[in-house]
C-alpha cells in the first residue's frame, strides 16, 4: 500500500549471523538462530539484492560421567506477505551448522543396576530459504535460492573405570533443509536456481562394563529409554523385548531436504531453471 516501506539502492545486502559454543557444560542448551524476515514493502535494487542468514552452534563435553546436551541451530530467510522486489540479480542463502560431541566416562555406580556412563545428544538444525505469501519477485538476471545444512553429532559412553552397570549413548537428530517458492508467490527471473543440501555425520558408541549389568534401576537413564515406546520396542530378541542391557546405543535421525516450486501463481524463467536437492 501507500504506507509500505520502500528501499532503493544500487546493491542491497541483508545479513544475519549467529554463533554459540557451549562445549564444556554438563547440561547445556546451545542455541544459535539467524533469521531474515521480509513481510511487506518494496525493495528496488538497480544491481544485486542479497540476503544471507547463518546459524552455527557447538555443544558437548568430555571426561565427565554424564552428559545431556540439546544443540539448536537455524539459518532462515522468509520473504512473504505483499513484498515486492525488483533487482538485476538476487541471491538468497541460508546456512545452518551443528557440531556436538559428548564423550563421557564412568559414573562409578554403586550397583550393577545403575548407569555406568551416559551420553545423550539431541540436535535440531534448520536451514531454509522460502518465498511465499503474495510476494512478487522480478529479477532481470540470475536468481538463486540456496540452503545448506551440516550436522556432526558424536555420543560416546565409555565406562572405563566402572566395574559394572549399563552404559547408554543416545543421538536424536532433526534436520530440515529447504529452498522453496510456495503460497501465492509470483517469481519472474532471467534464470532461477534452487539448491538444498544436507550432510550428516553421526557417531554413536556405548561400551559395556567388565562386570556387566542387571535389570536397570527405576529412575536410571537406561530404564527411561528402555521404557520409551519409541525406542524400547526396537530392542528385541527372538524371545521378545529386552529388559537388561550392558550397553545401549540409540540413533534417531529424521532429515528432510527439499528444493521446489509449489506456488499457485506463475513462475516465469526466461533461461535455465535448476532445482537440486
Regions found by a protein language model. Name each.
Residues 1-277:
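Low-complexity, glycine- and small/polar-enriched segments
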Amino acid at each position: 500500500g501507500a504506507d509500505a516501506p520502500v528501499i532503493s539502492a544500487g546493491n542491497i545486502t541483508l545479513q544475519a549471523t549467529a554463533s554459540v559454543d557451549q562445549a564444556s557444560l554438563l547440561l547445556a542448551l546451545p542455541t544459535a538462530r539467524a533469521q531474515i524476515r521480509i513481510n511487506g514493502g518494496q525493495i528496488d535494487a538497480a544491481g544485486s539484492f542479497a540476503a544471507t542468514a547463518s546459524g552455527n552452534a557447538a555443544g558437548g563435553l568430555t571426561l565427565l560421567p554424564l552428559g545431556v546436551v540439546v544443540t539448536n541451530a537455524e539459518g532462515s530467510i522468509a520473504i512473504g506477505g505483499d513484498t515486492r522486489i525488483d533487482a538485476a540479480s538476487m541471491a538468497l542463502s541460508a546456512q545452518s551448522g551443528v557440531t556436538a560431541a559428548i564423550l563421557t566416562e564412568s559414573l562409578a555406580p554403586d550397583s550393577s543396576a545403575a548407569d555406568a556412563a551416559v551420553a545423550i545428544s539431541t540436535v535440531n538444525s534448520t536451514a531454509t530459504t522460502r518465498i511465499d505469501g503474495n510476494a512478487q519477485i522480478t529479477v532481470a538476471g540470475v536468481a538463486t535460492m540456496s540452503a545448506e545444512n551440516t550436522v556432526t553429532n558424536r555420543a560416546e559412553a565409555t565406562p572405563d573405570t566402572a566395574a559394572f552397570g549399563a552404559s547408554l549413548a543416545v543421538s536424536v537428530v532433526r534436520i530440515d533443509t529447504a529452498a522453496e517458492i510456495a503460497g501465492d508467490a509470483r517469481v519472474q527471473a532471467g534464470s532461477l536456481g534452487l539448491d538444498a543440501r544436507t550432510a550428516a555425520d553421526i557417531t554413536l558408541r556405548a561400551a559395556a562394563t567388565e562386570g556387566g549389568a542387571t535389570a536397570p534401576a527405576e529412575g536410571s537413564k537406561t530404564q527411561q529409554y528402555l521404557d520409551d515406546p519409541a525406542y524400547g520396542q526396537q530392542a528385541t530378541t527372538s524371545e521378545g523385548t529386552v529388559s537388561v542391557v550392558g550397553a545401549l546405543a540409540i540413533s534417531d535421525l529424521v532429515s528432510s531436504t527439499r528444493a521446489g516450486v509449489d506456488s499457485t501463481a506463475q513462475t516465469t524463467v526466461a533461461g535455465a531453471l535448476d532445482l537440486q536437492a
